[in-house]
From Swiss-Prot:
It comes from Arabidopsis thaliana. InterPro entries: bZIP, bZIP_sf, Hac1/HY5. This is Transcription factor HY5-like. PANTHER family: TRANSCRIPTION FACTOR HY5-LIKE, TRANSCRIPTIONAL ACTIVATOR HAC1. GO terms for cellular component: nucleus. The gene is HYH.
Amino acid sequence: MSLQRPNGNSSSSSSHKKHKTEESDEELLMVPDMEAAGSTCVLSSSADDGVNNPELDQTQNGVSTAKRRRGRNPVDKEYRSLKRLLRNRVSAQQARERKKVYVSDLESRANELQNNNDQLEEKISTLTNENTMLRKMLINTRPKTDDNH
């Protein structure tokens, strides 16, 4: 009963690689969780050798080396680093997209505020001119008082 490792050499993995190039971007970003499969593959493949294995003996004595060696397996390390790298790439791309949306919102808001400011300045100028004109009219329409009276 031998199980293959996650990136073991087989004809199915080569056909999987061909199929993987045809997948969409969304499918490429999804990473299957193979951590448990990788650790069981190591134990079951070593059990098939028929050789007295100290790891297998310790496991039979009740000491679980699978959990202890789980992080040390080079296949698992490579898988985890690739998985982390993929997550980081996706996260960075999402952050860039959020930043683009944020910056474009800021730019449109700045344009709106600038237009509003221009309109208000024009209104201030118009009202100031009107106020000045009305004051002059008020002065001209007042009856002149004679001091000689």
